[in-house]
Swiss-Prot record:
The gene is Hrh3. It comes from the Eukaryota. Residues 1-39, 92-108, 178-196, 381-396 are extracellular. This is Histamine H3 receptor. Residues 241-256 have a biased composition (Pro residues).
Amino acid sequence: MERAPPDGLMNASGALAGEAAAAGGARGFSAAWTAVLAALMALLIVATVLGNALVMLAFVADSSLRTQNNFFLLNLAISDFLVGAFCIPLYVPYVLTGRWTFGRGLCKLWLVVDYLLCASSVFNIVLISYDRFLSVTRAVSYRAQQGDTRRAVRKMALVWVLAFLLYGPAILSWEYLSGGSSIPEGHCYAEFFYNWYFLITASTLEFFTPFLSVTFFNLSIYLNIQRRTRLRLDGGREAGPEPPPDAQPSPPPAPPSCWGCWPKGHGEAMPLHRYGVGEAGPGVETGEAGLGGGSGGGAAASPTSSSGSSSRGTERPRSLKRGSKPSASSASLEKRMKMVSQSITQRFRLSRDKKVAKSLAIIVSIFGLCWAPYTLLMIIRAACHGHCVPDYWYETSFWLLWANSAVNPVLYPLCHYSFRRAFTKLLCPQKLKVQPHGSLEQCWK
């Protein structure tokens, strides 16, 4: 991300314009404000480092997570972890004192790494959305490629290469191409900070294009899910009318109040969305808000994915012997039970699809919320050379951008059942051994 002079004290020519900076470069924060800001920054660092470290440790502890789509989540966690472990800590004393004290060499390294990590984080989000898009719209070919780990590694490497090429060469060579550096002593920001043409080009590649791509992929997933839902509903209606009342047997016993659930103990019920009726494909896990790639194959549930799980509802009555013809009453009972089972599955999947749609909307909204203010203010600030955007708005915008690295572990892995189980294995191993299913909720509570 573009680093501003901490107080916005640079005019168009790059000369110092404030008496405070000339006197010592201090920001002018009171002791109380300095303590509050330092505490908030430390909290952001801890949240970013721990959240993403937990994702990386999960890959070490649970080999079942090492699938192609989850590798992309690992790539995202690595970039976000380094943001919290390297980029933010070096910037904290700079923003609190208004002066860079680590030297010009470390300044260059910090800028290259910061720009690289932020861009790679964005590109990884695009890659995750694209992978989910393929898992839903091209499920057959996608499943066939799940064993090709080299393909995933190539995509991950491409993300880092593109992220470096976006800003790295410009940061390293700008002062040599322009005939000298315009950055005063005690400051650290990119030479192209006020070059509007470069920034609009870079912003298009770093934010506008990725944002539109993520929106397109997730909207396509939503429309695909809605289309398949309508097809299932239409197929259920075309199955034929119910038999007349006089041909119908007495209704089966009333099912439990929670469709698709079974007792879990202590008066609770466990949803069967991972085990029974309406089981979703790994790419969009049922009940997990559809976040992140699954640990299995990444394909969304097909219209026939629950044929095996719903077979209990379509078993023939025991009175039917092998080779005997079913009576009209038995046939109507079987047909009715099948229709009830299909109706349950359709309602369950419709509820799941709504959750998936909401989760996809959250992903796009959070990404846009964290990146749009910074990108727009950066372009406006460059156009007017820093005179039309208050400094506190600009600094708030890129702290919001950094906060995206702390939010990503929540949006993607932590909302995924297989990752939560791996985290429970790390944090609450004893509870997982005693209560392998119920311990998940208890541990996270």
